[in-house]
Amino acid sequence: MRLDKFLCDTAGVTRTEAKNAVKKGQIAVNGQVQKAADYKVKENTDTVTFQGRPLSYAAFHYYMLHKPAGVITATEDKKESTVMDILREEKVKNLFPVGRLDKDTEGLLLITDDGELAHNLLSPKKHVDKEYLVKVRDSISEDDCRKLSEGVDIGDEKPTAPAKVERVAEKEILLTIREGRFHQVKRMLQAVGNEVLYLKRLSMGSLRLPKDLEKGAYRPLSEEEIYKIKGDK
C-alpha cells in the first residue's frame, strides 16, 4: 500500500494532507523518516508514526454507540445534530450508521465503514434479530402480545413477520423483530390500539448494548464482538 494511502486510511487526512506530511518529514516507517509518498508500506507489519504518534491499520472500523434521544441517525444534516457528530473526534473517513433509529429512540447503534457487513445485517433475507425495550401508554394484554408475536397489519402490503414478545411489566414489553420497516415498532403497537412512549434498542444480532455504556457514549468493538457479528450475516 502507498504511504499516502496508508495515512489517509489511518490518520483521517486527505491525500493532499498526507503528501504534505510526508514532504515535511513528519512520517517515519520502522524508525526511519520517509519522504516518498509512493513508498510501499506493509500495512500489517511495518511500524508507521505520524509526528511521533504510532498509526495502526485496520481494513474496517467498528464502533458501538449508545444513541441518545434528540439526535438523528444520519451522516450529516444542516439543521439537526446527528449520531456522527458524537464520533467527530474519530479520524476515520466514510463512517456511517448501520440502519436507523428514530430521533426519539435510544439504544444500540453500530457505526462502521464496512459496507458489506452493513448490507448483510440489514438484509431481510439474513433474519438478524433486533431486540427493543418498549414502554407504552396503556396496559398491554396477553392477547396483544399474542397478536404482535403472530404478526399484525401495519398498513403495508404484508403483515409484519412473526416476532418474539415478552411482557415484563403492565406497560412494558421486550420485542424482538427481524424486519426493519419504517417506524415498525411504533406502528405495531398502534395496530393493537396502543402507543409507544419510550423505545430503546438493546441488541442487534449477537451485539448487545452493555449496561455500563452511558447514553451518548461509544467505544470500538472488541475483536470477539467483530467476529461474532460477522457470523450473524
Regions found by a protein language model. Give the residues of each.
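Basic, flexible Lys/Arg- and Gly-enriched helix-loop patches that mediate nucleic-acid binding at interfaces
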Residues: 1-233
